[in-house]
Amino acid sequence: MGSIMDLEESKIIELKNLIKKSKKIVFFGGAGVSTESGILDFRSKDGLYNLKSKYDEPYEVMLSHSYYEENTKTFFEFYKEFMITSAQPNEAHKYLAYLEKSKDLTIITQNIDGLHQEAGSKNVIELHGSIKRNYCTNCGKFYNEKYIKNSKDIPFCETCNGIIKPDVTLYEEPVNEYAFLKARFAIEQADLLIIAGTSLNVYPANSLIYYFYGDNIVLIN
């Protein structure tokens, strides 16, 4: 056990040294970054994929564009129960916010929880959107997640009575092109890429790592 602990400690020291000498850092994070905040990931044994609930459909169906269109009421019932939480930033979020104050750091996240910004990070690229942003599909009026959470059944716009849709990338929907290109540019410019909390199974987000031409990649899982 002592040798394993020594190895872990040495890796931490090595990572700190890499961070110290790097000029442009990209942190590329997935669901595992937020599990310490109590948010379910997707593929672990306790994640959404293996969730046994009152819903008969798997999570990727419940969170698909076609399900949103065809079963809007049930979509929002599921979405409000599992996607909108009272989670708070954990130590990883807080450390990255602290690091941003002294280093040129870009955070690229596949998460939609908005916890990086809550921790204080400014330079965050959200590949799959955020639960914090919701817009009327008719007039475009903005609503926060509390309005969605507190709405009865389907959330409707106070101005025009249109349905409000979360600004998140559902299954069957393309990733926001602007966010993807911005993330690609950040990775192309970086000399240190830190990948954490992701299995790199989700396309096209996983293709971004092929645009890294820097010196060091660190994988934390």
Task: Describe the function of each predicted region.
Residues G2-N221:
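Conserved catalytic core of sirtuin-type NAD+-dependent deacylases
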